[in-house]
């Protein structure tokens, strides 16, 4: 999958999810559904972030246009995340994983909704 295509699938797990502060970035995006991705751990320190490890991560999968993807990617990459490709039940999708060592509190369930 290439992010140069007309539309791109993304998997989001934190502040871009429904009901979260940055979900407005996904206005007009096509919601494909929820999934759990194996091989990731969720942490929280001011912001949520996922790192590779033993665990699972709850994601929402969307199809977005190229412009939306590029806008989100610029923000995520600029704050320390890196873009990776993951497998979901909806097909391959891009996910932003944390680019450094884990810190903060681990959310063992892998679900950002547990953070209040």
From Swiss-Prot:
Protein's name in the database: Putative gamma-glutamylcyclotransferase PH0828
Keyword Nucleotide-binding: no
CDD domains: GGCT_like
Binding site for substrate: 13-16
Task performed by this protein: Putative gamma-glutamylcyclotransferase.
Enzyme class: transferase
Assigned keywords, A-Z: Acyltransferase, Transferase
Source organism (scientific name): Pyrococcus horikoshii (strain ATCC 700860 / DSM 12428 / JCM 9974 / NBRC 100139 / OT-3)
One of the record's GO molecular function terms: acyltransferase activity
């Amino acid at each position: 999958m290439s992010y140069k295509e007309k539309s791109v699938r993304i998997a989001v797990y934190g502040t871009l999810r429904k009901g979260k502060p940055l979900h407005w970035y996904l206005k007009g995006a096509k919601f494909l559904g929820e999934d759990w991705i194996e091989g990731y751990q969720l942490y929280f320190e001011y912001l949520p972030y996922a790192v590779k490890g033993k665990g699972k991560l709850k994601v929402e999968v969307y199809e977005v246009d190229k412009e939306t993807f590029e806008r989100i990617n610029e923000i995520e990459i600029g704050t320390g995340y890196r873009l990776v490709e993951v497998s979901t039940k909806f097909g391959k999708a891009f996910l932003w994983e944390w680019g450094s060592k884990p810190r903060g509190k681990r959310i063992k369930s892998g679900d950002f909704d547990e953070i209040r």
